[in-house]
Amino acid sequence: QEPVAESGLGEDGHPARGGFLPPADNRNRMWAGGRVEFLRPLEAGGEARRVSTIKHIEEKQGRTGALLFVTVQHDYLQDSRLAIREEQDIVYREPTPPKTSSGEPMVAGGWREAVTPTPTLLFRYSAVTFNGHRIHYDWPYVTETEGYAGLVVHGPLIATLNLRAFCRANPDARLRRFAYRGLRPLIAPQPFEVGGRIVAPGKAELWAGDHNGLAQKAEVEFD
């Protein structure tokens, strides 16, 4: 995300709401999922430009209360040509106990990789993505204020590890589209697995989870 001065941050470590993102009262922020479309390669060393827009805002009523869904679109251009289009789904929810199980068991078959999400890994990912959300590194805040059992693994980090596992298992694949959806949080340092399987020519299903079941589902389209 864009760098923001300390004075421009909210209590949770994110940029204060009401600027680019809409105000959302005192609700907690969660990353619900996203989609990435790879249209053409970005040239290393070349100048690129990102254009960000709010594509969709929707209020829903869930089992835990009111939910505000926001979809942000990022277009990455080089030489005035669109190279990558990313959509991020963000949800703001009322403070409620986080889910500990999705009710969906882990999937068998295909490739699998074990992951141990250390606090250092979470901190480094927060740093490289300029993500100040305190649920990823501030133990007192995440456990006492937001009610999680420990540090929360970033949804995009899980997606990144899932995509890396896919590329390792399919080194000749050329990515076209990637989509993922969060089902529940993963808590560090509890180990989890990422994995997947080819379900059709040019298409794979990916997943991530632990002994409590699935935490994220994803799909890849490739050549």
Mark where each language-model region is.
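Catalytic strand-loop segment that frames the active site of acyl-thioester-processing enzymes
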Residues: 1, 78-79, 90-153, 167
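Hydrophobic, proline/glycine-rich low-complexity stretches
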Residues: 1-47
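Generic detector of short, locally flexible boundary/turn motifs and exposed helical patches
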Residues: 13-19, 39-42, 51, 116-117, ...
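Intrinsically disordered, low-complexity boundary segments flanking structured domains
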Residues: 17-24, 100-104, 164-168
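Catalytic-pocket segment enriched in acidic/His residues
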Residues: 142-201, 205-219
